[in-house]
């Protein structure tokens, strides 16, 4: 009988053990036998008007103070208002989810029956409620879906936990946490993002990028790109005041909305910006959101409560037993939450989630885009798993109001959940492991069990 040398024996045993461990994984990777049991769609509001007015009669910030030429007008007046095209795009997206969820078996096509299994919640502003209603009209066009929301001035603890009194924000800690990410030298951001600031200035003051010498600031105008970037105490909307970076973000905010809303090319950055140019400039806006909402301390304060309710909702669906703090009831199959990009950024940071879609910078929460959490069950093992993805219309799909089908879907990317995702193409995460990841991530003092 041939006897293996000792070292070869050990190596053989290791290979055999590895094969046994990987066997189920490889099988699961090649055949997806899971069935969708519940989905949580956490989306951003649709395309809107800018957050600042073009002009103001008295004191106060206005967009035209930042630019040589007047900012273009949108088809609808007002600040932070859902545009008609924005609403249309939300209905298109809702229609796509209708197709997908019907294919997956969560919807039957009988809207009056399916309505009983849908829970929809929106932060209490006209922009966000309007987005939710438009999405619902695509998801269940023949039903009148109730949009759950808090009536202002009451704050929704899911989306505004600090204002609602659920979470406490230590502003000094927030300043320290952000300052720590910048090495105590926030003005270094101006050097790191010099190309973006240079492009921003050329667009706002209407001269070719790269022109030398650089023109002086027009009389009576504010050069937001020269305002010092600092870290100081902010408010509940922007917990940390980042000085010039916040001013730049406000000035460039209209550009992505101009493009996505379908304004003529001559009115998108006054004809100076393509989709690629907007994406480059928006690295400044994205950096602001990253510091304000993806900083770990801030994510824990601002997003622990919504995360707690979402996890409880999944557990309730998996067990079939009512659970305190869960959204909907044990039979709820579809949960739609609509808020802002700040909310999505915070939740993503809490779980260390990242994504990248064509035409966008990393981790961008695009207008109407959504983090999607699928609760699925293996038909062979009965195990529940969580599958995460990010879904969004591309900039051109938004601009052109492109119809969506299963054959021509929005852009999407699977999202890896650190701490529990396995090495398959969809980064599946066993529900039990996801619950443990959530327990480690959620700051219990910033979460409650109320709806």
PLM region descriptions:
Residues 14-24:
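Bacterial N-terminal signal peptides
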